């Protein structure tokens, strides 16, 4: 229920607003998902309707009606990174990752960071569609740090249904260093293995060598 509605007399250009019986009124609002949001195909539903009266006073006794309920859903996703040895199977401890998302200006801003520890699986929850960058900020001892991985999360929803559903979910690498993601629409997960290799990185021409 919205209780703090304001009287509108002019639009955003300062022009007088005239409302007739044929006027179409659109109410827009924003909301932020919290840590209790459901991840995956179930989505987070929101139902809206308008109760109206032919009496202009909110406390009046005129007849009332209600518009048909309109249901929408907001979907959120998770990226799951499995850290593995160069055999591409053995879990590898000692890594830490930071996930960034590209904003409207094209700049990457930090979403969250997971520090190194005993875990070999890193789960980044509460993500939306968009462009991301994964950086290995801590590397297992004796292994080479991987290059940053940039990828794009894309999703399609059935927006016209009375029960909105998630139709597709993909993540595609957009950088030279590529990851292959496996998608699971049900739990909203995009999973990839990140491989670390042992040894020294060969120096570039003219640079100081490593041992």
Model-derived regions: residue spans:
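Solvent-exposed loop/turn and edge beta-strand elements of beta-rich ligand-binding domains
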Residues: 1-211
């Amino acid at each position: 229920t919205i209780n703090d509605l304001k009287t509108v007399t002019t639009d955003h250009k300062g022009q007088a607003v005239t409302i007739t019986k044929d006027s179409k009124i659109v109410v827009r609002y924003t909301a932020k998902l919290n840590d209790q949001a459901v991840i995956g195909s179930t989505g987070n539903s929101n139902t809206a309707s308008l109760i109206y009266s032919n009496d202009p006073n909110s406390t009046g006794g005129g007849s009332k009606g209600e518009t048909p309920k309109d249901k929408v859903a907001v979907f959120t996703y998770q990226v799951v990174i499995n850290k593995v040895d160069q055999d591409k199977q053995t879990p590898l401890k000692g890594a830490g990752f930071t996930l960034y998302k590209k904003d409207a200006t094209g700049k990457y801003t930090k979403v969250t960071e997971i520090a190194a520890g005993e875990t070999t699986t890193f789960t980044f929850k509460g993500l939306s569609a968009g462009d991301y960058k994964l950086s290995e900020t801590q590397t297992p001892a004796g292994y080479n740090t991987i290059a940053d991985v940039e990828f794009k999360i894309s999703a399609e929803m059935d927006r016209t249904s009375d029960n909105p559903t998630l139709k597709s979910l993909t993540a595609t690498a957009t950088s030279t260093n590529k990851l292959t993601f496996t998608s699971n629409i049900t739990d909203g997960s995009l999973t990839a293995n990140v491989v670390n290799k042992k040894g020294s990185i060969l120096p570039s021409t003219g640079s100081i060598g490593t041992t």
